């Protein structure tokens, strides 16, 4: 590959650490958590802890391979190297499909959040505006992207911490609630902690895993990280603490100060909770934060697909034109392709603004879980491929080795079973498997084309 089509290593440890902090703090938490709360009640806290453990196992498996061999197409390349070309092809394209679906959910959420302030403006106008703005940002240098993502993430992380502190002020001292402490009795006084039974908590796991979708972007940043051996482990090791603080902490506060069964879905439950309590100033600030979070998520979505398609083009799994980069090292063709695909979200928000999110979230969960399964299978094959002395020399090993990875794999297969069990999300399983069939057909055509090219040479 010519040097002019190479990506540039412009992401510092600071950029990558905050991308790790911010990557999973987005639409799944700020908006999708409402559906998870409805399914499980307060026991959704336990679901987020269980899902968080699985997410950390996936990140450690990806981190082990990323530190050993940092590459822009990351898990697609690892699947190709360890499981074969077909696995790499399916993984790369399914990740692009996943992130496109997630991005549609993110831009849809952006329109919903803007609707809180401007209820008379159609959602699709906001969706179109944000798609064009993010496209422009991603056509600049990777350093501009990293800097913008740093400040997006810094702002939402800082505000969530302030919100948690303020929430404890309401819980303990009644600040902003007329001096009346709310306590934490709401966690059990509306049907108990397991208000919808154990089954409700288990069923919520699919929405919980949607919230964690996107964390795998840290593997993709390895190709543009200045010092992947330091930055990747630091970023991944921050995962357990951020799950406890940002997911469990925020939802603990929300469900303590406001009954879980009155959390609505007409906007972010974070915003609606403060609105219902009459603290409109806090609600307005939080709406601005969730807007920032969705912008950050869309920004990362476009970045992730762009780098994945670029790497796949280098591997021969995507059209060669996708490997083209600008003078600044930006894969501009793939950024424009992603932007064009996102215009479909504008159309969806025009024809069915009320029902877009839940359908898209379940479809994204299937694609996300599929990619995670391929990451874990790649790590198992990667370990088997290495001689024992090289396994010992690995700089960032999965704790517990392959046994831990297999445990994560069983959990993810269970999540796919849940998607098929739930009537509202079963269709996403059909669409997901149809997507895999389409990819297999595409692979057959690709192989035939490659053979013809080889014969003609």
UniProtKB/Swiss-Prot annotation:
User: What parts of the sequence cross the membrane?
Assistant: 18-38, 39-59, 85-105, 114-134, 157-177, 198-218, 243-263, 278-298, 332-352, 356-376, 400-420, 425-445
Q: Which GO terms describe its biological process?
A: amino acid transmembrane transport
Q: What keywords would UniProt list here?
A: Amino-acid transport, Cell inner membrane, Cell membrane, Membrane, Transmembrane, Transmembrane helix, Transport
Membrane-related topology note: Multi-pass membrane protein
Q: Which residue stretches are annotated as topological domain Periplasmic?
A: 106-113, 178-197, 264-277, 353-355, 421-424
Q: What is its main location?
A: membrane
Q: What does this protein do?
A: Permease that is involved in the transport across the cytoplasmic membrane of proline.
Which family, according to UniProt? Belongs to the amino acid-polyamine-organocation (APC) superfamily. Amino acid transporter (AAT) (TC 2.A.3.1) family.
Q: What is this protein called?
A: Proline-specific permease ProY
């Amino acid at each position: 590959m010519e040097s002019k089509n190479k990506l540039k290593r412009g992401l510092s440890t600071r950029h990558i650490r905050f991308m790790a902090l911010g990557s999973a703090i987005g639409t799944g938490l700020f908006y999708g958590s409402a559906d998870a709360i409805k399914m499980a009640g307060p026991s959704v806290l336990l679901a987020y802890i269980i899902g968080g453990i699985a997410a950390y196992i996936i990140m450690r498996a990806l981190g082990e391979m990323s530190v050993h061999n940092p590459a822009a197409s990351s898990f697609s390349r690892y699947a190709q190297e360890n499981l074969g070309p077909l696995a790499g092809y399916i993984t790369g394209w399914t990740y692009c499909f996943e992130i496109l679906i997630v991005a549609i959910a993110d831009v849809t959420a952006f329109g919903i959040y803007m609707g809180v302030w401007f209820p008379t403006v159609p959602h699709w106008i906001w969706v179109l505006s944000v798609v064009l703005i993010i496209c422009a940002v991603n056509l600049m240098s990777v350093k501009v992207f990293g800097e913008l993502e740093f400040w997006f993430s810094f702002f939402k992380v800082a505000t969530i911490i302030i919100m948690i502190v303020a929430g404890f002020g309401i819980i303990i001292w009644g600040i902003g609630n007329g001096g009346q402490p709310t306590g934490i009795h709401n966690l059990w006084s509306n049907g108990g902690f397991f208000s919808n039974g154990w089954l409700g908590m288990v069923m919520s796991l699919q929405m919980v895993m949607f919230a964690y979708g996107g964390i795998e972007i840290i593997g993709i940043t390895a190709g543009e990280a200045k010092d992947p051996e330091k930055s990747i482990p630091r970023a991944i090791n921050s995962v357990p603490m951020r799950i406890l603080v940002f997911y469990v902490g925020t939802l603990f506060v929300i469900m303590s100060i406001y009954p879980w069964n009155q959390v609505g879905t007409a906007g972010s439950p974070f915003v609606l909770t403060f609105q219902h309590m009459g603290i409109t100033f806090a609600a307005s600030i939080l709406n601005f934060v969730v807007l920032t979070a969705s912008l950050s998520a869309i920004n990362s979505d476009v970045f992730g697909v762009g780098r994945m398609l670029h790497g796949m083009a280098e591997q021969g799994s995507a059209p060669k034109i996708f490997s083209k980069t600008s003078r600044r090292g930006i894969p501009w063709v793939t950024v424009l392709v992603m932007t064009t695909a996102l215009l479909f979200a504008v159309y969806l928000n025009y024809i069915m603004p009320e029902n877009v999110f839940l359908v898209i979230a379940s479809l994204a969960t299937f694609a996300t879980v599929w990619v995670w399964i391929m990451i874990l299978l790649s790590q198992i094959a990667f370990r088997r491929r290495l001689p024992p002395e090289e396994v010992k020399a690995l700089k960032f090993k999965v704790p517990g080795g392959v046994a831990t990875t297999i445990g994560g794999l069983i959990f993810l297969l269970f999540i796919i079973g849940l998607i098929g069990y739930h009537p509202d999300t079963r269709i996403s399983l059909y669409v997901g498997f149809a997507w895999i069939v389409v990819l297999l057909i595409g692979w057959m055509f690709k192989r035939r084309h490659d053979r013809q090219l080889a014969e003609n040479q």
